[in-house]
């Protein structure tokens, strides 16, 4: 796939000279974030109460209570500025954990369907209970390992997938791209991406029918923690060889394998 390889080389070469300079409006600029305006006051209140409970339950660290909005809720809602959830679209939240970014996005975009996937039943029980409290009819919680889920009926059925804290980019690519329909996008919020990791992700994407499309500033990052979103695109159908069996993507990431053979 020469087009995919050219794209990977172009992107990583541009990034290797240093991350681009942006002026980004952060969620802490001014008294309130623009992302909160996508919610009604009642929805914002319910979300804040839900994630205060998530802190108490240990799904978020104790220090997060004071920065729920700027580090978590605004951060989740701001993804819609990069890729707006459209009515009837299917979004997958990979390794959903405490439902971030999926639950806040589902509140703000009730015509879009969100599937929250996690291997830990306790977290998913909380996500389901919270979705019920928020009166969300557009949320489904799936208890599964992504390696198995990506080989089932949901394969290549999603328009967009998000992965907030799933692992290194090559691992995220292998677990996420098989779930996307051709033309879909995988959004991966990060801190400042490492050039080597981006190169490995680009190599992994070549094998998975995708490419690393762009690295864009995360407009909702707090001012003291500038972040980016890595965007991977699904170009052609993924080979049935992927994802590999449970645990293998994390132990032997695709991009690292290819990189070591150079």
Predicted regions and their residues:
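Conserved SAM/SAH cofactor-binding pocket of Class I
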Residues: 77-165, 173-176
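Short "lid" loop at the C-terminus of a central beta-strand within the Rossmann-like core
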Residues: 147, 191-195, 220
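Short glycine-/small-residue-rich Rossmann-like dinucleotide-binding loops
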Residues: 165-166, 236
């Amino acid at each position: 796939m020469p087009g995919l390889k050219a794209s990977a080389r172009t992107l990583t070469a541009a990034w290797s000279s240093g991350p681009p300079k942006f002026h980004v409006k952060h969620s802490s600029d001014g008294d309130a974030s623009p992302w909160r305006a996508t919610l009604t006051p009642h929805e914002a209140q319910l979300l804040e109460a839900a994630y205060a409970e998530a802190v108490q339950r240990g799904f978020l660290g104790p220090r997060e209570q004071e920065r729920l909005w700027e580090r978590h809720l605004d951060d989740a809602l701001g993804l819609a500025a990069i890729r707006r959830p459209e009515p009837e679209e299917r979004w997958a939240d990979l390794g959903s954990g405490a439902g971030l970014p999926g639950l806040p996005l589902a509140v703000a975009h009730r015509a879009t369907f969100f599937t929250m996937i996690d291997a830990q039943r306790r977290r998913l029980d909380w996500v389901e209970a919270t979705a019920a409290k928020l009166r969300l009819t557009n949320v489904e919680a799936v208890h599964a390992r992504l390696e198995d889920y990506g080989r089932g009926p949901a394969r290549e059925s999603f328009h967009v997938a998000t992965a907030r804290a799933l692992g290194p980019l090559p691992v995220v690519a292998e677990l996420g791209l098989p779930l996307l329909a051709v033309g879909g996008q995988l959004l991966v919020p990060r801190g400042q991406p490492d050039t080597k990791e981006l190169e490995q992700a680009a190599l992994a994407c070549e094998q998975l029918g995708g490419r690393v499309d762009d690295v864009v500033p995360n407009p909702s990052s707090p001012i003291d923690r500038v972040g980016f979103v890595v965007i991977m695109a699904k170009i052609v159908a993924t080979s049935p060889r992927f994802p590999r069996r449970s645990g293998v993507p994390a132990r032997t990431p695709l991009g690292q394998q290819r990189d070591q053979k150079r």
